[in-house]
Curated annotation (Swiss-Prot):
GO cellular component, one term: plasma membrane
Topology with respect to the bilayer: Multi-pass membrane protein
Name of this chain's protein: Olfactory receptor 2V2
Physiological role: Odorant receptor.
Residues the record marks as carrying a glycan: 6
UniProt xrefs under Pfam families: 7tm_4 (PF13853)
Length: 315
């Protein structure tokens, strides 16, 4: 047994992690790092393409660039520290580092959830009111949508970080997770945190179910509009417009609701760790692939970029 188990740690916490040093876990760690690399490169590339190509300077792609920025920050919040601890054999994280992880994680997950909900409204306007789309989704509205998503997430993250980090923590301070996940951290508090946990649950309900209700309402209206279309080509275009967003929504909300909206007696640390890997690493990797591989405009921008690089290298 490692020496840190028999010591108390007053300046920070110990992260028990998700991987041991068995052969199977080494393979899984390699897979997670490969996924992390793809997520990093994919989101950076998508942001770059949207910024560089004038044809992608539309509301939908502006929202997509913000989503990619959130995903990029999300994978960089927890995975590098997890990898550093695993490779070095150290399991510690400083008190300040733990607080930063909590604040960033809550902020980014909350902001992304709200943005995905408001992106559904954008799809609704594009399909149900195409003639009024440039007016209803002008630059000011787009900035308000993304700004409100970031603002709600930042406020939520700051409040929860300050409250959680002001609780007294006892004993060995071993967090049964691969990052400073708030609910795992609260189990180590020396005081009763049940009231705050109820507040967290209420925040999760708002930050997840409120945008999810916008998504359901938007797609209900979209479905009504699509059913009234008589052209097969119009059907295909409408479904293609929505399919990428629906896939991203299913991945993100499925994992987030599984963790944060389950009754407490159904929670298991091992399940939470796997679900956290899913939407902190896998979803950020899949989002740029979903939105680019199934989108002609993004693929066209990528081909033009590659052609420019090839021509430049020949000269």
């Amino acid at each position: 047994m490692e020496t840190w188990v028999n010591q108390s740690y007053t300046d920070g916490f110990f992260l028990l992690g998700i991987f041991s040093h068995s052969t199977a876990d080494l393979v899984l760690f390699s897979v997670v790092m490969a996924v992390f690399t793809v997520a990093l490169c994919g989101n950076v590339l998508l942001i770059f393409l949207i910024y560089m190509d004038p044809h992608l300077h539309t509301p939908m792609y502006f929202f997509l660039s913000q989503l990619s920025l959130m995903d990029l920050m999300l994978v960089c919040t927890n995975v590098p520290k997890m990898a550093a601890n695993f490779l070095s054999g150290r399991k510690s994280i400083s008190f300040v580092g733990c607080g930063i992880q909590i604040g960033l994680f809550v902020c980014l997950v909350g902001s992304e959830g709200l943005l995905l909900g408001l992106m559904a409204y954008d799809r609704y306007v594009a399909i149900s009111h195409p003639l009024h789309y440039p007016i209803l989704m002008n630059q000011r509205v787009c900035l308000q949508i993304t700004g409100s998503s970031w603002a709600f997430g930042i406020i939520d993250g700051l409040i929860q970080m300050v409250v959680v980090m002001n609780f007294p923590y006892c004993g060995l301070r071993k967090v049964n997770h691969f990052f400073c996940e708030m609910l795992s951290l609260l189990k180590l508090a020396c005081v009763d945190t049940s009231l705050f946990e109820k507040v967290i649950f209420a925040c999760c309900v708002f930050m997840l179910l409120f945008p999810f209700s916008i998504i359901v309402a938007s797609y209900a209206h979209i479905l009504g509009t699509v059913l009234q279309m008589h052209s097969a080509q119009a059907w295909k275009k409408a479904l293609a417009t929505c399919s990428s967003h629906l896939t991203a929504v299913t991945l993100f909300y499925g994992a987030a609701m599984f963790i944060y909206l389950r009754p407490r007696h159904y929670r298991a640390p091992s399940h939470d760790k796997v679900a956290s890997i899913f939407y902190t690493v896998l979803t950020p990797m899949l989002n740029p692939l979903i939105y680019s591989l199934r989108n002609r405009e993004v693929m066209g921008a990528l081909r033009k970029g590659l052609d420019r690089c090839r021509i430049g290298s020949q000269h």
